[in-house]
Structures are given as C-alpha cells and as structure tokens.
C-alpha cells in the first residue's frame, strides 16, 4: 500500500496510463477513426504489446483500463515497476506523432463517483488524481490539441483541490466549469432529455 501523501500522485499515474492505453486501443482497432493510421505506425505501438499494454481486439474505455491496471499491478512494488518503465516516454511520443494526423478524439469521464458513498476518502483521492492529470494534459502540448478528456468531479473534491497549496492555479481557470443546478437548469436538462425520447416511451392517453 501507499502512504497518504503518495495516493493522489499514484492515482495521477493510473489515470495517465489508462488514458494512454485507451488511446492506443483506439489507434489500433477503431476502424471508424483510425483510417489515416499507417501500418508502420501501428507496428511501432505493437512492439509494446504484452509489456505495457495487452493485445487489443476492440477499443477500450478509460474506465476499463483503470480496472485492468489496478487488477494487474495490485501491489506497491509491481505498480512502481510498471510506472517506472522507460517505454512510457516512448509511447507518449509515438502517440503524439500519430494523433497529429488524425481527427481529434474525445473522452468523457462523468461517473467516477458511483461508489463514492462507500469509501469517500478513497474516491476523493481518485478524483483528485484524475483532475490533476487532466489539467496536466491540458498544459502539456504533447498531443497537439488532438486529445480531449472531459471530466466531471464532485463539488467536495473541487473544494479539496481549492484548499491545497496549488489552488491559485485553478481559480478562474477557463477550462473548469462549475455546474450550478438551479430550478431552471434542471428543468431545461429534463426537457431536453424528454424531447429526444422516442414515441414508444410515452403512454398513449387515447
């Protein structure tokens, strides 16, 4: 296990690796998006298969990759060894070069807190790690504005971030949007959802 001070940092690594692995799986198997990926580029990534990531048959979600990483590297030593592999830097460069020739890809992470109530402090660290990782991706132009990760975190997680020593970085950050769910906003949300439902979901009053 990791010390309290290390947990958020380790979660940052988990999210980084999960995001990269998910992108790699899409580059290799997403035929609707990867049409401009050359066989040469695919082969560059396949050199790392079964070491850094498995052989993919289908595109994998970031959630799936988080789960797979945690199940395969469940001890302190095994995770640290995985995180310290020099191949990660190589993969990051290769992925960045490939993405430059592709359409932008978007990932949406909005249900990290489904288990929050069962272990709030554990999931607090998880979500903080996600937030810090995404903000670091935003500031690090490795992927040429082609990789976009949109996340949703709980209000108390954001409050904890704003109480940290680095809080000034995120005050008035243009990429952070606070959702204020007043009555009008909730009404608009539900009416928009209802408007998109098919007729078969409505009761015929006749």
Please report, for each region that a protein language model flagged, where it lies by residue.
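P-loop NTPase nucleotide-binding core
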Residues: 1-106, 115
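The catalytic "switch" region of P-loop NTPases
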Residues: 90-108, 112-206
